[in-house]
């Protein structure tokens, strides 16, 4: 019985704070996750790509965390960052998101039924560690669960097109049927 309790407690901590080695044995796990986020990813992205608008980069990561589980287009993300008071161009937003993907901060998943252009420009993004979501969002439990499932699927099935989401062009009506099309 003690073994099950320890496993549940360890999973609960992993679920909330993630599994980065730096935070596992830390006294203040949230601070350790914050340090890892700041040092490894933000500093790596900022230094490697000479990002000058660091506040917009941080806001972009926050908006991605707020949108976990939702398809996120570059236009929508740019608008969300601008509405938060950070001036940013769409091309800059695209670059910042690509930097986050290159640094393995976030992982993209494409819509299987979208056009090729839509697959690249309207994806779902998941953070590589659940602790990062906890840093960027006030009530993250549902998003952390979806993030954890997405990470498991990506690890199990690979980072290619075998993991995707399905979002049809037309959503079903309240009765659960797709609208009929007349030819």
Regions from the PLM with identified roles:
Residues 1-19:
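Amphipathic alpha-helical segments of the small helical/lid subdomains adjacent to P-loop NTPase cores
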Residues 24-182:
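Accessory nucleic acid-recognition modules appended to NTPase machines
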């Amino acid at each position: 019985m003690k073994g099950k309790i320890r496993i549940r407690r360890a999973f609960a901590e992993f679920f909330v704070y993630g599994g980065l080695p730096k935070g596992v044995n830390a006294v203040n796990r949230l601070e350790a996750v914050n340090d890892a986020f700041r040092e490894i990813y933000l500093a790596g992205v900022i230094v490697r790509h000479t990002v000058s608008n660091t506040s917009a980069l941080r806001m972009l990561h926050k908006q991605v965390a707020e949108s976990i589980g939702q398809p996120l287009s570059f236009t929508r993300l740019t608008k969300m960052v601008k509405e938060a008071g950070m001036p940013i161009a769409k091309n800059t937003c695209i670059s910042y998101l690509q930097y986050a993907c290159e640094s393995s901060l976030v992982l993209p998943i494409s819509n299987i039924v979208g056009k090729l252009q839509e697959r690249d420009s309207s994806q779902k993004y998941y953070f590589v560690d659940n602790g990062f979501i906890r840093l960027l969002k006030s009530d993250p439990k549902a998003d952390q669960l979806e993030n954890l499932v997405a990470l498991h699927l990506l690890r199990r099935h690979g980072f290619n097109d075998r993991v995707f989401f399905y979002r049809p062009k037309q959503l079903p009506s309240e009765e659960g049927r797709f609208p009929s099309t007349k030819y």
